[in-house]
Amino acid sequence: MINVIDSMCGSGKSTKMFKMMQESYGKNPNKRFLYVTPFLSEIDERVPKELPSMNFKTPENKGSGKLSSLCDLVTKGDNIATTHVLFSVLTSEIVDQIIKMQYVLVIDEAIGCVGLLNNELKKSDTTALLKSNMVFVDEE
């Protein structure tokens, strides 16, 4: 299921997402999260401050690079915070591993990420997703 939260800038969307993650994790600490944001400050400052019990890890630019580090974190089942840039270059193998490990994907400021699918999704695909309730728009 995809839950889209759309609202004015500064209306508390990120805060709402953080609260939803914290509540979900509180109910099931085995749940895994992949949080994607365009802002390094969110990863470096806000995530550790607001979600300390979830122990989010960040891909590091060591050894084989950030993409390899992300793959390692997914394989270990860590909660992960990363950027849109790194998310945009995921390989199909990493995506398969994310699915296999049953990650909850949370994309903040998702316009750029969703744009990656524009060449693959047709209007009829979007309509079918909405009608099947696999995607919905949160009116809050």
Where are these regions (language model features)?
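Helicase motor interdomain insertion/brace
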Residues: 8, 13, 76, 138-140
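Conserved Walker A/P-loop ATP-binding site and its immediately adjacent core
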Residues: 9, 15-60, 85-87
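Inter-Walker segment of RecA-like/P-loop motor cores
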Residues: 51-90
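Signature of the SF2 helicase/ATPase Hel1-core->accessory helical subdomain module
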Residues: 87-140
